[in-house]
Amino acid sequence: MEPLLRIPFLKRTVFKSMTDITYTGRRSGKRVTLPIVFERRGDDQVVVGVAMADRKTWWRNFASGPEPIGIRLDGVDRTGTGVAKVGDKGTAVVITLDPLP
């Protein structure tokens, strides 16, 4: 999926709310990159909904509190911290972005 996300026309149209996140696995210690669909909340927050959370494990890396995460937004690699939120409306990872230098 990543190469498709880098094609400018597709990025602006079809994949407007898709990008990649990168984090280090809590147990494995391995760097993981995966495509996600996101929603921006202001300038400093991004929400990643987790569909069928009971069948996925990646979001659990953020369940015990803020953990470092990378995300590519508007062609810029950003860093921040992610926290998993589980509620009546489902599961999401809320990313608070670090300020730009």
Please annotate each region the language model reported.
Residues 16-51:
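Short beta-strand segments
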Residues 5-8, 27, 36, 63:
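Solvent-exposed, flexible loop/coil residues
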